[in-house]
Amino acid sequence: AAADPQLAHLSSLSGGWMTGLQFFLRRDLRLAPGHLIFADSPWALTGISQPQFWTPDVLKTFGNGTAAGVLSVCISDWTQPGLFVRKPARECTREDMLQAVCAQLQSHVAASGQDRLEDRDLVDWYLSDSVEHRPDGTVVNHEPLLINTAGSWWRRPEACSRIENLFLASDYVRTHTDIATMEGANEAARRAAEARLSESFAT
């Protein structure tokens, strides 16, 4: 912080868990033309069916080629007990987490009258590598998401620091995208790359 005062505010930024799973399905389950919000799910689930935005047949290159659908789901609340597994997500094993998320999804899809999500639809699933289940039973998230609280934009650092050869590229960097998103992180990365190139040409 002494070398670059803007870095002194990093510890005051708030972070939270918003990490998820991907379900690889035997069929393309198109629940909506865009993002999904499971409004009353205790774990505040959101999701999106991916293949509708991809080129045809791209899934044939995944794994053994049997998956025809991909449903990405984010868990936004890791502190509330679930409906079907009566524990918060951050206290669940990987298997508990799979069971709880699938049950919440199936319940919401069935209630909406849409095409049902069945257990037999699941080919495989993936939990973000940033979520670590330790041997003592604790769960750690190594990549918490910036929480965009009021006034936080002014405490966020620029991509180019005052420290030689230190550039920042992440969702917490100050950009024109005043919210933690992949787009904001991408913009920060472009700014960091441009700053690095500018320094290279300057020397």
Name these PLM-found stretches.
Residues 1-156, 162-187, 194, 200-201:
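C-terminal segments that line or cap access tunnels to active or ligand-binding sites in enzymes
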